[in-house]
């Protein structure tokens, strides 16, 4: 970018990111997350466009349809600010930020849904269930804290990379191999779900905790191995639940050897 070109100050960038945490607060059927996105980017537009008419025009172009995974949208927000700086410097046409958003929202929504919604969150939900059964509410607080720390760190990284790299953010996110990582997390999550089923059944039948813990570990290991060898996810999950309940019932009937 040329010398003396307008830049968004760090404070405004921080406000933009903070506002992005409320991206879905004004969700609507017509524009989906458009109002939340416009609200998030407004501090950057205020820093770039001193003229109210120009600022109003810039804000209006961000009121069009927008829908993405709320965590992955941080990368688009950062990249859009990157392009708005170029528009303010006269290096790009006003439509460039809109085209950037339209191009990335679909692919990043798919990546975000696959990693966060169908892999990371279910895994931590299962861990919270198992941890709460074994150790009580402190385990629930711990798992929630870790999950939120992970997604906040990733969101900050997405936002910074989008702002600094612009279009190159696509390559950076691709190198993270989130789809492959999501598959491994799903395998682990299925195993933990089987362990949770074993613990619930064991608790109901007053099986000693040591026996329940070993049964849960066995179910988790068997479920993970089955999935790693190509077994369908839903079959492995049902089998893990069945084995877990069966172990709990056998232990209840014949006593725990542990």
What are these regions, as identified by a protein language model?
Residues 141, 200-216:
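Structural signature of hydrophobic alpha-helical transmembrane segments
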Residues 220-244:
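Interfacial loop-to-transmembrane junctions
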Residues 96-98, 161-177:
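Juxtamembrane inter-helical linkers in multi-pass membrane proteins
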Residues 154-158, 175-206:
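Alpha-helical transmembrane segments of helical membrane proteins, especially in multi-pass transport
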Residues 138-152:
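Alpha-helical transmembrane segments
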Residues 99-132:
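Transmembrane alpha-helical segments and their cytosolic interface motifs
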Residues 1-93:
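Soluble N-terminal domains of membrane-associated systems
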Residues 245-258:
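Juxtamembrane boundary at the C-terminal end of a transmembrane helix
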């Amino acid at each position: 970018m040329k010398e003396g070109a307008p830049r968004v100050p760090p404070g405004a960038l921080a406000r933009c990111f903070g506002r992005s945490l409320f991206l879905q607060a004004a969700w609507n059927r017509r524009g989906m997350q458009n109002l939340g996105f416009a609200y998030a980017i407004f501090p950057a537009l205020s820093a770039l466009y001193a003229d109210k008419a120009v600022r109003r025009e810039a804000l209006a172009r961000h009121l069009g349809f927008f829908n993405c995974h709320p965590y992955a949208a941080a990368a688009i927000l950062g990249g859009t600010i990157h392009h708005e700086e170029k528009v303010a410097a006269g290096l790009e046409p006003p439509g460039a930020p809109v085209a950037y958003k339209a191009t990335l929202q679909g692919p990043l929504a798919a990546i975000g849904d696959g990693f966060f919604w169908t892999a990371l969150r279910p895994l931590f939900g299962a861990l919270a269930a198992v941890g709460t059964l074994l150790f009580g509410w402190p385990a629930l607080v711990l798992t929630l804290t870790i999950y939120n720390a992970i997604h906040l760190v990733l969101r900050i990284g997405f936002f910074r990379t989008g702002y600094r790299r612009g279009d190159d953010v696509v390559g950076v996110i691709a190198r993270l191999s989130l789809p492959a990582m999501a598959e491994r997390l799903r395998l682990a999550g299925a195993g933990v779900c089987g362990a949770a089923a074993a613990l619930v059944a064991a608790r109901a039948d007053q099986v000693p905790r040591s026996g329940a813990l070993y049964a849960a570990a066995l179910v988790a290991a068997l479920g993970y191995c089955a999935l790693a060898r190509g077994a369908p996810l839903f079959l492995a999950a049902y089998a893990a639940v069945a084995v877990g309940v069966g172990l709990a019932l056998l232990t209840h009937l014949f006593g725990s050897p542990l």
